[in-house]
């Protein structure tokens, strides 16, 4: 999973993700927008569900983040289906509306985002 952080002329940080992970970039750009407290909440949730059967979800204005002990899923709220309806090999997939990745990979992006934010 490749990513890039950019700062626009107003100083706002934008995240660009590799193909198949665009929704993760959109989540950072639309939901996080520099809100490090939200990232604290996500990191705490990842620690809480690690090694358990539990999952956690955070619905935002445009995107919802789900995570369990192994995987993170970010989907556009406009898709309107629940996590239970996603099946192996599902036929509906839109790279910009749905992204899946491992928890550790996601937390690496979160850490890199924090680091980039501090380089003002």
Curated annotation (Swiss-Prot):
Pfam family name, one: UPF0231
What InterPro entries is this protein classified in?
A: UPF0231 (IPR008249)
The record's NCBIfam families line, in alphabetical order, gives: PRK05248.1-1, PRK05248.1-3
**What's the family?**
Belongs to the UPF0231 family.
Protein name per its UniProtKB record? UPF0231 protein KPN78578_01240
């Amino acid at each position: 999973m490749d990513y890039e952080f950019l700062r626009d002329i107003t100083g706002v940080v934008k995240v660009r993700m590799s193909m198949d992970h665009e929704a993760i970039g959109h989540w950072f750009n639309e939901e996080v927008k520099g809100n490090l407290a939200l990232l604290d909440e996500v990191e705490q949730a990842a620690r809480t569900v690690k090694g358990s059967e539990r999952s956690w979800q955070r619905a935002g204005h445009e995107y919802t983040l789900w995570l369990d002990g192994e995987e993170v899923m970010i989907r556009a709220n406009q898709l309107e289906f629940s996590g239970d309806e996603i099946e192996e090999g599902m036929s509906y997939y839109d790279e910009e509306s749905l992204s899946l990745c491992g928890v550790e990979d996601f937390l690496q992006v979160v850490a890199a985002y924090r680091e980039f934010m501090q380089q003002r």
